[in-house]
């Protein structure tokens, strides 16, 4: 369809119709019943026995012999081309034209200027005489090497190949190089000194330094003119007196003339005495520490034995220790006989192992009440306290190990309505 928009030479108008393939007769016979002729195919005297209205698609610009791009007065059109529809032809109307295809249009001449092939643009086909020959398609690389604008010569309007101008004899321009550009003058101003970026940075730095010096001098002058905020301000700051303290003194000075208030000197003296005087609680604590220090001396009876009492649950133990060969008796029995379990015997000897005096003491104790576990705990606490009374320096190690702490855990009492202290009876719903 686009081919109708371009102008063609008169001698090439019917070439397209001749070279195009003829449509099949099946299509034309299929369209024939659509004719509006009521004569049923009768002749009209043009020699082919067919009416003009039998043409299924009768376009004014294509089939009309008086107007359109195919109407012409030259000898070629009147010579009688088959299918032209003119009186000088064979009397047959042109068959249905083939649909437009972009691939076929690209193979044809896009711009037809009077029958000559456009210069500078290669087409897929070129007419030479009466034969059609295949030509090479246009290549971008080869097109760059050829003349872009021009007919058949090497020069067109003074421009040569590769953009050189030969009429004015200009030299081919060299590609831009950064190294050569840095060595030369970037902006040639007729002998003037070129503008340097480094010089501008140095000037900006100098201006900044000058500005800082001016601001510093102004600040020093303002400090000298205004002076400190308060008289002897530096001395007050160094002495540690804060603004809150000064405000409190000023407030007390304001109440100096009020009746019923003591003078300011008496108030200051009372405050000074209260701060320097020791409190009664501190005195009590100091007295207790002195008493404890006096009590940390060896405490032995008339026989030279240290005594200690221990309690655990319901058991009460009384322990006497003295330097000896390592004998250990519980209720007039050897402790390994009284406590057959190895864990109980090891628990009794732990205070001695902690003080590193195992085997250096003769221990005699009596215990009553409670069970085996309670009696073991009571004897252990009694031994620890007896060691402390014999040698007060052992208190630190025994205290750190926890042997001087009384275990206050006892059996919890039974509650009413329960089987034991916390155990409940079996609950029955009904």
Curated annotation (Swiss-Prot):
Biased composition (Low complexity): 68-79
A Pfam family hit: Ribosomal_S9
Keyword annotations from UniProtKB, A to Z: Mitochondrion, Ribonucleoprotein, Ribosomal protein, Transit peptide
Subcellular location(s) of the protein: Mitochondrion
UniProt entry tagged with the keyword Mitochondrion: yes
Keyword Ribosomal protein found: yes
Matches recorded under HAMAP family: Ribosomal_uS9_B
Subunit structure: Interacts (via C terminus) with PIA2. Component of the mitochondrial ribosome small subunit.
Protein name: Small ribosomal subunit protein uS9m
Protein's organism: Arabidopsis thaliana
Organism classification: Eukaryota, Viridiplantae, Streptophyta, Embryophyta, Tracheophyta
